[in-house]
Curated annotation (Swiss-Prot):
Cytoplasm in keyword set: yes
Name of the protein described by the UniProt record: UPF0294 protein KPK_4510
Classification lineage: Bacteria, Pseudomonadati, Pseudomonadota, Gammaproteobacteria, Enterobacterales
Coiled coil regions in record: none
Gene Ontology, cellular component aspect: cytoplasm
Length: 265
């Protein structure tokens, strides 16, 4: 779906900018431009949340309070309403959204809010084979204070499919980028891993990419058929804290993870 795949970048005081996918991945690590570090302190705080197109009240309160001081906010089903765009540009330097579903007024898709401008941005889309509804993903890269480059993958995985072929297909271009990235990685979002075959495909992908799963001691993540839908995977970092907020502001509960730049335990 490369033809209709792009990201929209929202920055305070500037018109929205369309970002096209970079050229074909040539099997080598791209040369990134210089940039400002994502965080100036020793922690990287990441909020992950399927925001349900902001259809319920209190979504903004959750972002402001539970996500306070987050360096990255990875939203799924984010609809670019004036309220969300205003929140994003008032609290973050850059917000990049990949429109998956173009609704009559405001497109919906994954959106990554960041305290620094990304030095790399690659939007991705995959169409669900049954309902023909696209799902989106976004790969961005940010400098860290220790001079390493953090790759961030925000994904909303396909939901309705027979078997896991399309599910696995959506992960392939993400895997290409992670495999050629030598620095730390965070991959998070709504993976729709509601069946054993989907879980197996996801965990197999994580193993192949040398990604670890963030564990939540009080695991209140949204479930379907007894299986969690939202995950955070990482590489080249260590987890300092991880929590889930129980809320009615969406049909998913947001995840908050605090990373340290050091190596995993």
């Amino acid at each position: 779906m490369r033809k209709n795949t792009y990201a929209m970048r929202y920055v305070a005081g500037q018109p929205a900018e369309r970002i096209l996918p970079p050229g074909a991945f040539a099997g080598v690590s791209p040369v990134y431009p210089a940039g400002t570090p994502l965080s100036s302190d020793e922690k990287i705080r990441v909020l992950v949340w399927n925001i349900f197109k902001q259809q319920r009240a209190e979504w903004q309160s959750v972002l402001k309070n539970f996500g306070k001081d987050a360096h990255l906010v990875l939203l799924q089903e984010a609809q670019t309403t004036p309220e969300l765009v205003r929140f994003a540009t008032s609290n973050y330097l850059a917000a990049d959204q990949v429109p998956a579903l173009v609704l009559p007024q405001h497109p919906s898709g994954v959106m990554t809010l960041a305290s620094a401008h990304p030095i790399y941005c690659c939007p991705l889309r995959e169409r669900e084979p049954i309902l023909r509804l696209p799902k989106s993903a976004l790969v961005t890269v940010y400098p860290l204070p220790d001079a390493r480059l953090l790759m961030v993958v925000n994904i909303h995985a396909v939901n309705f499919s027979l078997g896991v072929d399309v599910y696995s297909k959506q992960l392939l271009p993400i895997g290409d980028q992670i495999a050629h990235h030598s620095g730390p990685v965070i991959m998070a979002g709504d993976f729709n891993a509601w069946s054993r075959p989907r879980m197996n495909a996801l965990y197999r992908f994580a193993r192949e990419m040398s990604l670890r799963e963030v564990r939540f001691s009080d695991d209140q993540r949204r479930r379907a058929f007894g299986r969690p839908l939202d995950f955070v995977f990482y590489r080249g970092l260590s987890v300092h804290d991880a929590s889930v907020l129980v809320t009615r502001a969406s049909d998913h509960n947001p995840l908050l993870v605090e990373f340290s730049p050091g190596k995993p335990d």
